[in-house]
Amino acid sequence: MPKMKSHRGACKRFKATASGKIKHERMNGSHNLEKKNRKRSRRLHQATILDSAKEKQIRRMILA
């Protein structure tokens, strides 16, 4: 059986932290920012930790 390949698109979007959590950038923060208020656009530029519901699935994609 061949080795499992990691999902290249997921590897570009998600990173594993030193403690093992999965970090990712938020969506909707790159364009059409004039429609969004300052508080929202500021928060969209901060990275966040992935919630536990999707963590197992993403971990298999990036660490395979």
Swiss-Prot record:
One Pfam family from the record: Ribosomal_L35p
Entries under SUPFAM superfamilies matching the protein: L35p-like (SSF143034)
Keywords tagged on the record: Ribonucleoprotein, Ribosomal protein
Bias kind Basic residues: ranges: 36-45
Region of interest (Disordered), ranges: 27-47
InterPro entries in the cross-refs: Ribosomal_bL35, Ribosomal_bL35-like, Ribosomal_bL35_CS, Ribosomal_bL35_sf
Cellular component GO terms held in the UniProt record: cytosolic large ribosomal subunit
GO biological process, one term: translation
One MF annotation (Gene Ontology) recorded for this entry: structural constituent of ribosome
Family membership noted in the UniProt record: Belongs to the bacterial ribosomal protein bL35 family.
NCBIfam families on file: rpmI_bact (TIGR00001)
HAMAP family from the UniProt entry: Ribosomal_bL35
Protein name: Large ribosomal subunit protein bL35
